[in-house]
From Swiss-Prot:
Belongs to the peptidase S8 family. GO terms for molecular function: aminopeptidase activity; endopeptidase activity; identical protein binding; serine-type endopeptidase activity; tripeptidyl-peptidase activity. It comes from Homo sapiens (Human). GO terms for biological process: intracellular amino acid homeostasis; protein polyubiquitination; proteolysis. PANTHER family: PEPTIDASE S8, TRIPEPTIDYL-PEPTIDASE 2. The active site is at D44, H264, S449. This is Tripeptidyl-peptidase 2. Residues 998-1018 are annotated as: Disordered. The lineage of its organism: Eukaryota, Metazoa, Chordata, Craniata, Vertebrata. It catalyses: Release of an N-terminal tripeptide from a polypeptide. PROSITE patterns: SUBTILASE, SUBTILASE_HIS, SUBTILASE_SER.
Length: 1249
């Protein structure tokens, strides 16, 4: 057998399938129609120009004509202009950049910017580089530093047993070094490479250079022009292998660094048009076609598509006069064939004759799971994913060939408005090229993302032949050829494969033979606001129904009016189903004609039924239908009380890839269903997909969807639960995984349960005290254990500013239609470290269907550092924030300024995850709730029985810090006692907050008034005048006022405190250090330290005015510590200044004070005195402790205090102090990483959208 296997030729044809679609036979017939002359726009994650097969076409042209990033994720603000001095400029990173003499720059001006590599590195590359940098750059050096620090500590401990103050500090120093190194290891965070960017005009074109080596020597970096000008690209290094190109906009003020955001786009392009001159068996479907790479997957959003990216992409597609678009992206949409993005796509297709091919989606096997735009937009050809036996052997290495099938996950039609959804199918898997940064040449990927470029490449072959023979075509004629010649697989349902598997050769022949004007037309089919007839819910199929259907011709752009006038089509209408009646003929001219179709589903058996009313031109009936009216009817099974609302299926046989659909009328009052699957096989484990979908008008299928991929062991059992809506049909689909081998038998049961709450969402206002809700067990006996859990507090924000302006050159639609942006700014405070989820309620969950071009928010800290971003789907963009103040900038784009101005006061919300969940008390009657007595526990409700419950308000001390009026707590109510019921039947809860109660402060002002003697007006005036003079003393910098007050009030402590603060805050503070020391001594001398120490030692103060005394003593202690620290800082600054000048601290007589004590001794005395009263890590003491360590050259202790200062006040200056100490300690690796963080943490401005 081994010999036979080695002699059998390798199935290369199955790696990137072409036989199944007729592409291989087409190329055998017409080898020169291999895509030449065809330009395919690949809208994806970007294409790597250095990837295998992405260099040239079969006729020697550049494979990629241009590479564009339309998302903005690679944009660099280069508006800052500088001129070199002595051939050097200082980049925004702080590095000195050496300008090569060979560069030509007539103006002498350079635009500079900065970009963190991790901002545009693909996620997988970023993770790999982070791991490699830690292993190669950090770990070896850090291990040596840590070992050395531990060794020094051990040696000191062995050699020194004494506990003198000096030894104590040295021991603390060595211990600090070890602790810091351990801490740095735990907190290790790689900032990644930070690149300086330069842009300049050489007199002819704009050029850019990125300091990819991060060393400032630009002679070693690549100078690039816009990619389209010379197909130039660079690489970020042999470790990264990340290729990049550039585009320069806005007169050099904006640089776009274009990289691939993932491997997906290159793989897609390779399937469609990869070319390997030396290995033709690896070619894509259309190796002669050229590629326009457009990155629409935003790296900031994990390569999620955005409205900005898509609309800019369509502008580029039109400007480059592309023939085809491949779009292997898509999302579920709330309403099909609508929205701003879809409008722009329609314009490109209808007005510019651009064929738009897209993936149908990977959300099967249930019906109506097609994505947008592939399966929901009339102008787009949606492609399903098919797998052939050859693919199973070559790509997936299956032990045996299975019959051809649709992949289990391939999305199915119809769309929610009745359109078929899937147009055609193509092979949905391939082993093809991927970007170099993956360190792989090829990779297996599957999905409708792969079927779409396979079909797109096939269409490129057709267009190549048509162009070579000067045969006119339209998007309508090409689509009709594809659909009318596709081959239907008998074992695959129409909603999965659409019209069938694309046949390139037959479609080409069709277009050559059918060149009539009628064939070039499109036809819009409307059924009210829908595009087909889709009867799904029980009420829709209970009786016959009549449907008015509009048929209207769509002419290609620039059609002559005379041709429109002469249009006269004689159409025959046919239907092959007895349950549909339609007219036999229709005369169609240049207007919308209406016909009536009657659908009578009463005699249909349970299950799914599909048919079409087709319109044929009687002049050429063999050309196939000019249009189709899709009709779908679902007859749902009923469950009732006699079966306990259960459906059971026993010993059901499943072949590999087999799907069984069950349409069930959900009983009124049902709120969740449970499905139990049991394997009957004792030999075979089986992989199944359990999928359920209910459709609700203007809600995407995902809103009421359950999906579970499960592996069922031999004789194993699985139970799952999911929510349902009563009174509507549900599709429950159980599918054997497409690649499973061997047959298997299973039993499965679907059981419905219902606990109905009076409100679909529970809204509780704290001011009401007690809130009531009622519950009913609708179907059967149910065990209840009601529980309300609150997990988030939600903060509502209003914008502090809203600015509207026109966008740049990339944002102009055809006919000079300028796009505009509104940027709204919001501020909020994060009271403590935690997870937040920002969102814009008005626009969230809307992408393709939104009436606005796009939405994108970016959150910044108070230093303008970007912390995170998000767009239409907020649940995908939660992030962790530390305590502090933050700014959110929200960009909304549209063509009309007036529509943007309506949003100038748009609210925005930030949902904060609670560190500990909160619960509300629930009672079974009002009196228990009112008195806070017995809480509700478990109870059993009989069918149709109603039970009220009463919820009490949350105690005020449980309200999270920062939450207040205008905020609410969000959580859920579960009613069932069972775990499955708790998981499936969940009711949202909003708890609205009110102002907190007013709290009285400790100590009463009335008591103070009673205990004090009434002051006469003269005494009050004297004190007020004194305090006024003290206030002005600090402003006027006058010693005269101070001396005058000191004579009058020699024992008034606030006077001396004010003088100390005045001197310590002066601009020329360094010149008055001795005065600061004297002022601090004056403050200290006026505090009775003995009395203060005695008071602090007291455990309890029984005196009636204890609160007042405590307040006074706390102030005295705070003042004492403050004075000691200011004195210590002044002494330390004096010594550090002396050290900087002389290189050492003088301890001789010249440096002594009049009393005979040296500044160093005075500093030590002050330090140890301070430690008596407070901890060195107290916020007020940190600066003194830090400077004391510096004076004593104990850089470990200094760094420990400096890092604490950074935590309390993360300024750039504090970070620089840390870096300096790291260098003094010899920890250059720590210093280097920290230095790289600085331009990231403290950018010059907000990053661009």
């Amino acid at each position: 057998m081994a010999t036979a296997a080695t002699e059998e030729p390798f199935p290369f044809h199955g790696l990137l399938p072409k036989k199944e679609t007729g592409a291989a036979s087409f190329l055998c017939r017409y080898p020169e129609y291999d895509g030449r002359g065809v330009l395919i726009a690949v809208l994806d994650t970007g294409v790597d120009p250095g990837a295998p097969g992405m260099q040239v076409t079969t006729d020697g042209k550049p494979k990629i004509v241009d590479i564009i990033d339309t998302t903005g994720s690679g944009d660099v603000n280069t508006a800052t202009e500088v001129e070199p001095k002595d051939g050097e400029i200082v980049g925004l990173s702080g590095r000195v950049l050496k300008i090569p003499a060979s560069w030509t720059n007539p103006s002498g001006k350079y635009h500079i910017g900065i970009k963190n590599g991790y901002d545009f590195y693909p996620k997988a590359l970023k993770e790999r580089i982070q791991k490699e940098r830690k292993e190669k750059i950090w770990d070896p050096v850090h291990r040596v530093a840590l070992a050395e620090a531990c060794r020094k500590q051990e040696e000191f401990d062995v050699a020194n047993n004494g506990s003198s103050q000096a030894n104590k500090l040295i021991k603390e120093e060595l211990q600090s070094q070890v602790e810091l190194l351990n801490s740095f290891e735990k907190k290790y965070s790689d900032p990644g490479p930070v690149y300086d960017c330069l842009v300049w005009h050489d007199g002819e074109v704009w050029r850019a250079c990125i300091d990819s080596n991060e060393d400032g020597d630009l002679s070693k970096s690549t100078v690039l022009r816009n990619y389209k000008e010379a197909q130039e690209y660079g690489s970020f290094g042999t470790a990264e292998m990340l290729n990049y190109s550039v585009n320069i906009y806005d007169d050099g003020n904006l640089l776009s660094i274009v990289t691939s955001g993932g491997a997906h786009g290159t793989h897609v392009a390779s399937i469609a048009a990869g070319h390997f001159p030396e290995e033709p068996e690896r070619n894509g479907v259309a190796p002669g076609a050229q590629i326009l790479s457009i990155k629409i997957g935003d790296t900031r959003l994990s390569t999620m598509e955005t409205g900005t990216g898509l609309i800019r992409a369509m502008i580029e597609v039109i400007n480059h006069k592309c023939d085809l678009v491949n779009y292997s992206y898509g999302e579920a949409t709330h309403w099909p064939n609508s929205g701003r993005i879809c409008e722009v796509i329609n314009e490109a297709v209808w007005k510019h004759n651009i064929i738009y091919v897209s993936s149908a989606g990977n959300n099967g096997p249930c019906l109506s799971t097609v994505g947008c735009p592939g399966g929901t937009t009339s102008s787009v050809i949606g492609v399903g994913a098919y797998v052939s036996p050859d693919m199973m052997v070559a790509e997936y290495s299956l032990r045996e060939k299975l019959p051809a099938n649709q992949y289990t996950w391939s999305s199915r039609g119809p769309s929610a408005d009745g359109a078929l959804g899937v147009s055609i199918s193509a092979p949905g898997g391939a082993i093809a090229s991927v970007p170099n940064w993956t360190l792989r040449g090829t990779q297996l990927m599957n999905g409708t993302s792969m079927s779409s470029p396979n079909a797109c490449g096939g269409i490129a072959l057709i267009l190549s032949g048509l162009k070579a023979n000067n045969i006119d075509y339209t998007v309508h004629s090409v689509r009709r050829a594809l659909e009318n010649t596709a081959v239907k697989a008998d074992n695959i349902e129409v909603f999965a494969q659409g019209h069938g598997i694309i046949q390139v050769d037959k479609a080409y022949d069709y277009l050559v033979q059918n060149t009539s004007f009628a064939n070039k037309l499109g036809f819009t089919v409307t059924v009210g606001n829908n595009r087909g007839i889709y009867l799904r819910d029980p009420v829709q199929v209970a009786a016959p129904s009549d449907h008015g259907v509009g048929i209207e011709p769509v002419f290609p752009e620039n059609t002559e009016n005379s041709e429109k006038i002469s249009l006269q089509l004689h159409l025959a209408l046919t239907s092959n189903s007895s349950w549909v009646q339609c007219p036999s003929h229709l005369e169609l001219m240049n207007q919308c004609r209406h016909i009536n179709i009657r659908v009578d589903p009463r005699g249909l058996r349970e299950g799914l039924h599909y048919t079409e009313v087709c319109g044929y031109d009687i002049a050429s009936p063999n050309a196939g239908p000019l249009f189709r009216v899709p009709i779908t009817a679902v007859i749902a099974a009923k469950v009732n009380e006699s079966s306990h609302y259960d459906l059971a299926f026993t010993d059901v046989h499943f072949k590999p890839g087999q799907i069984r659909r069950h349409f069930i009328e959900v009983p009124e009052g049902a709120t969740w269903a449970e499905v139990t699957v049991c394997s009957c096989s004792s030999e075979v484990s089986a992989k199944f997909v359990l999928h359920a979908v209910q459709l609700v008008k203007q809600r995407a299928y995902r809103s009421h969807e359950f999906y579970k991929f499960c592996s069922l062991p031999e004789k194993g059992t699985l139970t799952e639960a999911f929510p349902v809506l009563g009174g509507k049909a549900i599709e429950f689909c159980i599918a054997r995984w497409w690649a499973s081998l061997s047959d298997v038998n299973i039993d499965y049961t679907i059981s419905f349960h219902g606990i109905v709450c009076t409100a679909p969402q529970l809204n509780i206002h704290a001011s009401e005290g007690i809130n009531r809700f009622d519950v009913q067990s609708s179907l059967k006996y149910e065990d209840l254990a009601p529980c309300i859990t609150l997990k988030n507090w939600v903060q509502t924000l209003r914008p502090v500013s809203a600015k509207t302006k026109p966008l740049g050159s990339r944002d102009v639609l055809p006919n000079n239609r300028q796009l505009y942006e509104m940027v709204l700014t919001y501020n909020f405070h994060q009271p403590k470290s935690g997870e937040v989820t920002p969102s814009c309620p008005l626009l969230c969950e809307l992408l393709y269907e939104s009436e606005f071009d796009s939405q994108l928010w970016i959150i910044f800290d108070q230093n303008k550092r970007q912390m995170g971003s998000g767009d239409a789907y907020p649940h995908q963009y939660s992030l962790k924030l530390e305590k502090g103040d933050y700014t959110i900038r929200l960009q909304i784009r549209h063509e009309q300024i007036s529509d943007l101005e309506r949003l100038k006061d748009l609210p925005f919300i930030v949902s904060h995850r609670l560190s500990n969940t909160l619960s509300l008390d629930i009672h079974e009657n009002h009196s228990f709730a009112l008195l806070g007595k017995k809480k509700s526990s478990n109870l059993t409700l009989p069918p149709k029985y109603n039970q009220p419950f009463f919820v009490t308000s949350l105690p005020d001390d449980k309200i999270p810090k920062g939450a207040g009026p205008g905020c609410y707590l969000a959580g859920s109510l579960t009613l069932s006692k069972t775990e499955l019921g708790k998981k499936a039947d969940v009711i949202p809860v909003h708890y609205y907050l009110i102002p907190p109660p007013t709290k009285t402060k400790n100590g009463s002002k009335d008591k103070e008034k009673d205990s004090e003697k009434e002051k006469d007006l003269k005494e009050e005036f004297t004190e007020a005048l004194r305090d006024l003079k003290i206030q002005w003393m600090t402003k006027l910098d006058s010693s005269d006022i101070y001396n005058e007050l000191k004579e009058t009030y020699p024992n008034y402590l606030p006077l001396y405190v004010a003088r100390l603060h005045q001197l310590d805050a002066e601009k020329e503070r360094m010149k008055r250090l001795n005065e600061i020391v004297d002022a601090a001594n004056a403050v200290i001398s006026h505090i009775d330290q003995t009395a203060l120490a005695v008071y602090i030692a007291m455990k309890t103060d029984p005196r009636p005015d204890a609160a007042t005394i405590k307040n006074d003593m706390d102030k005295q202690k705070s003042t004492l510590v403050d004075a000691l620290c200011r004195k210590g800082c002044a002494l330390a600054d004096h010594l550090l200044h002396t050290q900087a000048q002389d290189g050492a601290i003088s301890t001789d007589a010249e440096g002594k004070e009049e009393e005979g004590e040296s500044p160093l001794d005075s500093l030590a005395e002050t330090f140890w005195e301070t430690t008596k009263w407070t901890d060195l890590f107290d916020n007020k003491v940190l600066t003194f402790a830090y400077k004391h360590a510096l004076v004593n050259k104990m850089y470990g202790r200094g760094l420990k205090f400096a890092t604490k200062l950074v935590e309390e006040k993360p300024t750039k200056e504090n970070w620089k102090n840390c870096i300096q100490l790291m260098k003094l300690l010899g920890w250059t690796h720590c210093a280097s990483f920290t230095e790289n963080w600085l331009p990231i943490m403290y950018p010059p401005d907000y990053c661009v959208f």
